[in-house]
């Protein structure tokens, strides 16, 4: 739903090395749009609470990469034949400096907390460089802004954000520009979508460990288009597991049955005042990704 914040946990088959801990950094890929500023607002407030550092990352491309990127993507500059690489780089630096100045103004006015942040530029394909940086630096979370409900449905998440969500091993929090929340402490109820896969339990543990300093209730939901007794049996088993594993967490359990799964989910979100949707992005091979 357009009014909800989308949180995606990407859990893959490979195990994270136990000796490597995630850094106390929050990564914000920015494209100088209004929804980038919304992501900054949320991230800066989270960084204040978690005593974290914010990294603003912008990825630009030169004509070398132009043919590899889709038209109309919010991260792209339109490159004319008359533009030189030098001009492109100057434009990127100018835009990033303008963003930094705008953030400084918001810090001075008190709209943003005064926390440590830095700006980084990388050349390449946006989603690839975002994922590469996340793999290298291991931030605690990636926060990305998305378009609001006045935009076309296909644009709500955006191709770059969707690709990062699909492939990232780091939690990705996508913030619609029209979301009323300014910080995570305002979130009161989270929906966690499960397919009764064991990886969902791993994803939930990672999700819980990331946000356990906040207070919220969780709705564990399964989406289906037909009645299946096994769903009820599996749900009963999950109830028992979560009761033992998370005794202090308020959890609701529901099976949503609707011929139109997205319509059923949207209605559930409205009826139950869900603030964030959490889901697991399973690792798929190249053929599954294509088809």
Regions inferred by a protein language model and the residue ranges of each:
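Intrinsically disordered or low-complexity boundary/linker segments at protein termini
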Residues: 1-41, 112-114, 140-152, 156, ...
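Structural beta-alpha unit
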Residues: 1-4, 10-21, 61-64, 90, ...
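Small/aliphatic-rich secondary-structure junction motif
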Residues: 8, 18-82, 188-252, 274
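A short acidic, glycine-rich active-site loop
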Residues: 76-94
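N-terminal membrane-insertion helices
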Residues: 89-100, 235
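Short secondary-structure boundary segments
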Residues: 146, 222, 280-282
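Charged helix-capping and loop-helix junction motifs
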Residues: 157-160, 233-238, 290-291
């Amino acid at each position: 739903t357009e009014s909800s914040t989308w949180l995606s946990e990407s859990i893959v088959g490979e195990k994270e090395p136990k000796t490597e801990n995630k850094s106390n950094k929050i990564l914000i890929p920015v494209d100088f749009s209004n929804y980038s500023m919304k992501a900054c607002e949320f991230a800066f407030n989270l960084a204040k609470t978690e005593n974290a550092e914010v990294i603003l990352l912008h990825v630009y491309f030169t004509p070398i990469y132009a043919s590899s990127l889709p038209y109309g993507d919010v991260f792209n500059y339109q490159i004319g034949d008359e533009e030189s690489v030098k001009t492109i780089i100057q434009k990127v630096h100018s835009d990033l400096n303008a963003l930094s100045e705008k953030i400084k103004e918001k810090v001075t006015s008190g709209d943003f907390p005064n926390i440590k942040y830095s700006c980084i530029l990388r050349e390449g394909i946006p989603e690839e460089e975002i994922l590469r940086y996340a793999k290298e630096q291991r931030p605690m979370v990636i926060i990305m802004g998305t378009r609001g409900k006045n935009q076309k449905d296909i644009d709500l998440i955006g191709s770059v954000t969707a690709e990062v969500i699909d492939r990232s091993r780091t939690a990705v929090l996508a913030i619609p520009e029209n979301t009323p929340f300014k910080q995570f402490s305002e979130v009161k109820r989270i929906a966690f979508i499960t397919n009764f896969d064991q990886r969902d339990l791993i994803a939930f543990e990672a999700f819980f460990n990331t946000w356990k300093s906040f207070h919220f209730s969780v709705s564990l939901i399964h989406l289906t288009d037909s009645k299946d007794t096994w769903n009820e049996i599996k749900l009963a088993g999950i109830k028992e597991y979560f009761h033992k594993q998370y005794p202090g967490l308020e959890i609701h359990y529901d099976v949503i049955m609707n011929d139109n799964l997205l319509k059923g989910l949207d209605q559930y979100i409205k009826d139950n005042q869900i603030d964030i949707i959490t889901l697991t992005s399973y690792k798929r091979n190249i053929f599954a990704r294509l088809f």
